[in-house]
A protein has these predicted regions:
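Primarily recognizes the serine-hydrolase "nucleophile elbow" in alpha/beta-hydrolase
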Residues: 130-185
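N-terminal cap/lid segment of alpha/beta-hydrolase-fold proteins
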Residues: 20-59
Length: 249
């Protein structure tokens, strides 16, 4: 168990759990879908019948496909995720950016998210892989950012033999879970030199874990980039696409 998760669990014991806000997901969808320039909106469905938004952009020809997972309380076209889902198509990767579970706008604490939203987050990541695989898209990679990277880590803990052949992990606070040390897929860990303190301070722990990951795993620190890689998305997209080209051959 990582130190962050340990403190999160302690915090959960002290505060009431927050509720997932499906209404807010609908409002976010109504806000972003009319403004989409690249990609087609579609609905995916969980086993419980709950629909959630995804934005699909097909590369022609496609070298592979990437599922993108955004951070806390935002949407699948938000800032760095929105930029990457479009830029990766230009590099030959079909993208599927999915809406992750959100809380109400007044939820500010990290501990509100874990474990309340993680089970459905894990399922949505699995559903996205199934949808792409059913349409013949392969190989698959998962790209996550910020809180989405914790959700992705939780997904891989629950699905060690998942269909994702690679993981691009952006802006993860702290270190990877212990299960990641036995990862069967290469990992690209990317952060900014001006990232959040918890991301910067945890870089050595993530770098140590990558020593136990498969060949091709590496850590990249983008100089002068902040947590959202503002103004650096072009450089970030090149780092990601070049790495995918190498490990998904």
């Amino acid at each position: 168990m990582t130190r962050l998760v340990y403190f999160v669990i302690l915090a959960i014991a002290a505060f009431p759990a927050a509720a997932q806000d499906y209404g807010r997901e609908k409002r976010l969808e109504a806000e972003i879908v009319p403004a989409l320039v690249v990609g087609e909106p579609l609905k995916l469905r969980t086993a419980a019948g709950r629909e959630f938004l995804a934005i699909h952009a097909q590369a022609k020809p496609a070298r592979g496909a990437v599922v993108l997972v955004h951070g806390r309380n935002v949407h699948p076209d938000h800032e760095v995720i929105g930029a990457l889902r479009m830029r990766l198509v230009d590099r030959g990767y079909t993208t599927l950016s999915i809406q992750m579970p959100v809380l109400g706008a007044d939820a500010q604490r990290v501990e509100d998210y874990y474990p309340a939203l993680f089970p459905e987050a894990v399922e949505r990541i699995a559903v996205a892989a199934q949808w792409l695989s059913s349409r013949g898209a392969r190989p698959l990679a998962l790209l996550s950012h910020s809180m989405g990277s914790w959700m992705a880590n939780e997904y891989f803990d629950a699905h060690p033999s998942s269909p994702y052949a690679a993981w691009v992990c952006l802006g993860l606070t702290g270190g990877f879970s212990w299960a990641t040390y036995g990862s069967s897929r290469p990992i690209l860990d990317v952060s900014g030199s001006a990232d959040l303190p918890a991301v910067v301070d945890g870089a050595w722990r993530r770098r140590f874990a990558l020593g136990f990951a498969p060949e091709g795993s590496r850590q990249v620190i983008v100089e002068d980039a902040n947590h959202m890689f503002a103004g650096r998305d072009g450089e970030l997209a090149k780092v990601v696409a070049d790495w995918l080209d190498a490990v998904l051959r």
